[in-house]
């Protein structure tokens, strides 16, 4: 008799409460019980981790670029003005002790909380974060904007700044960051080389 009453009680309880938390994942009160919460809609907050890559390139490569640029510059000046620059600028000064290898190091510079302000047609999250930091006695406001794929959001609701598409970093209202900050154009190398001649 006792077994029958327990069975009837279980049947009665399941008929009154027919839902299960395993089948009701779509309901807000049961959502993310077993999953990790990540930013997914407008208004959600995530953390952007800004890393600095210190790329110590080999001096041998740098000297080869300088030598090539000097040769090009010397040929242009020689053809245009008839002056041989090799008499004035030493080209073969790449001593063996200056030829070192290179390595890449990465370190966390800052973490900025960002808010999802929009979702583009492809499902990417448009984020914007602001942070005010004190440098000496001055305050500087940093604004980070960009798009994040939901798959790039890591555990802890963080995303690496290198994963931001169409990214912009503003400091005190001035744009200071382009899409590929570590990539130096050929024009930048020429300007850096010419500046190095006069310093």
Swiss-Prot record:
- Xref: InterPro entries: Flag_Lring
Q: Signal sequence span per UniProt?
A: 1-25
Q: Which domain of life is it from?
A: Bacteria
GO molecular function term, any single one: cytoskeletal motor activity
Q: Say where the protein is mainly found.
A: membrane
Q: Name one GO cellular component term.
A: cell outer membrane
Task: Could you list this entry's UniProt keywords, alphabetically sorted.
Answer: Bacterial flagellum, Cell outer membrane, Membrane, Signal
The biological process GO terms on file are: bacterial-type flagellum-dependent cell motility
Where found, per UniProt? Cell outer membrane; Bacterial flagellum basal body
Family indicated by similarity: Belongs to the FlgH family.
Concerning PANTHER family, the annotation shows:
FLAGELLAR L-RING PROTEIN
Q: How does it assemble?
A: The basal body constitutes a major portion of the flagellar organelle and consists of four rings (L,P,S, and M) mounted on a central rod.
| Role noted for this protein | Assembles around the rod to form the L-ring and probably protects the motor/basal body from shearing forces during rotation.
Q: Which HAMAP family match?
A: FlgH
What is the name of this protein?
Answer: Flagellar L-ring protein
Origin species, per record, is Thermotoga maritima (strain ATCC 43589 / DSM 3109 / JCM 10099 / NBRC 100826 / MSB8)
Gene label? flgH
């Amino acid at each position: 008799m006792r077994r029958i009453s327990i069975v009837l009680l279980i049947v009665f309880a399941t008929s009154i409460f027919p839902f299960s938390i395993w089948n009701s994942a779509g309901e807000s009160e049961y959502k993310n019980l077993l999953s990790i919460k990540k930013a997914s809609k407008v208004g959600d907050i995530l953390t952007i981790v800004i890393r600095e890559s210190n790329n110590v390139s080999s001096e041998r490569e740098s000297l080869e670029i300088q030598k090539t640029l000097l040769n090009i510059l010397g040929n242009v000046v020689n053809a245009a003005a008839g002056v041989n620059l090799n008499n004035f600028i030493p080209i073969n000064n790449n001593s063996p002790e200056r030829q070192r290898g290179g390595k890449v190091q990465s370190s966390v510079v800052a973490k900025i909380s960002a808010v999802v302000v929009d979702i583009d047609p492809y499902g990417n999250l448009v984020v914007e974060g602001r942070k005010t930091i004190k440098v000496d006695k001055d305050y500087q406001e940093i604004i980070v904007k960009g798009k994040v794929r939901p798959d790039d959001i890591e555990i802890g609701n963080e995303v690496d700044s290198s994963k931001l598409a169409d990214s912009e970093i503003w400091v005190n209202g001035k744009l200071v960051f382009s899409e590929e900050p570590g990539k130096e154009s050929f024009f930048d190398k020429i300007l850096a080389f010419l500046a190095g001649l006069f310093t």
